[in-house]
């Protein structure tokens, strides 16, 4: 079974998808944002969109996406196993933002401000598996963020998050990408 997928960025900020490999130290050194998600690699319909937005991100908004395999179990056992996989990718001083439909709603400018406020730390965005995450991982999270009251497929959440990170970067830069 595939251990995980990683999307590191080069020094220029351009991304590439590497299957089953560890990120290079030089790629990690420039990273400030990591998206950790559970599930399969990107479906054909989502890959171009995620790629488009992640490749446009520049430091300090540069991001990597780590796709961890989903559990072969169901229910509580799956939630526990997947949360442990996520925990193994976190550092004790990470600023953790968990995406969950029961979280707090943030506008795009609020997200941009939140990232900018914590950009001196490593920021980890977490997209849990189909059964969610454990209460321990929820408590480790600094913010629980809801994209909407609606529930979305995980593939779509990855795309929305990638676009929102790009939008946050552009709001921070003062560009005309975001119209409010």
Residue ranges and their predicted role:
Residues 1-6, 20:
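Short, positively charged low-complexity motifs
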Residues 16-30:
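Short, Lys/Arg-enriched N-terminal segments with co-localized hydrophobic residues
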Residues 31-53, 57:
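N-terminal beta1-alpha1 ligand-phosphate binding loop
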Residues 36-38, 66, 126:
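Short hydrophobic segments within beta-strands
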Residues 41, 101-104, 129-132:
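Short glycine-rich anion-binding loops that position phosphate/pyrophosphate groups of nucleotides
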Residues 47-54, 80-83, 135:
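Short, surface-exposed alpha-helical segments at coil->helix boundaries
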Residues 61-63, 67-124:
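S-adenosyl-L-methionine/SAH cofactor-binding core of RNA-modifying enzymes
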Residues 135-179:
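Structured adenosyl-cofactor binding patch, chiefly the S-adenosyl-L-methionine
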């Amino acid at each position: 079974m595939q251990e995980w997928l990683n999307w590191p960025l080069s020094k220029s900020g351009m991304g590439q998808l590497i299957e089953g490999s560890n990120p290079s130290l030089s790629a990690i050194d420039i990273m400030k944002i990591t998206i950790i998600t559970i599930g399969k690699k990107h479906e054909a319909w989502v890959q171009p969109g995620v790629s488009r937005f992640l490749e446009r991100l520049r430091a300090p908004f540069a991001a990597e996406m780590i796709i961890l395999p989903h559990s072969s179990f169901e229910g509580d056992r799956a939630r526990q196993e997947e949360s442990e996989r996520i925990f193994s990718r976190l550092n004790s001083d990470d600023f953790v933002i968990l995406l969950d439909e029961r979280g707090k709603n943030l506008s795009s400018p609020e997200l941009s401000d939140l990232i900018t406020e914590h950009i001196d730390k490593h920021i980890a965005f977490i997209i849990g598996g189909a059964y969610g995450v454990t209460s321990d991982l929820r408590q480790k999270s600094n913010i629980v963020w809801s994209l909407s009251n609606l529930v979305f497929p995980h593939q779509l959440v990855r795309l929305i998050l990638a676009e929102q990170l790009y939008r946050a970067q552009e709001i921070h830069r003062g560009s005309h990408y975001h119209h409010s």
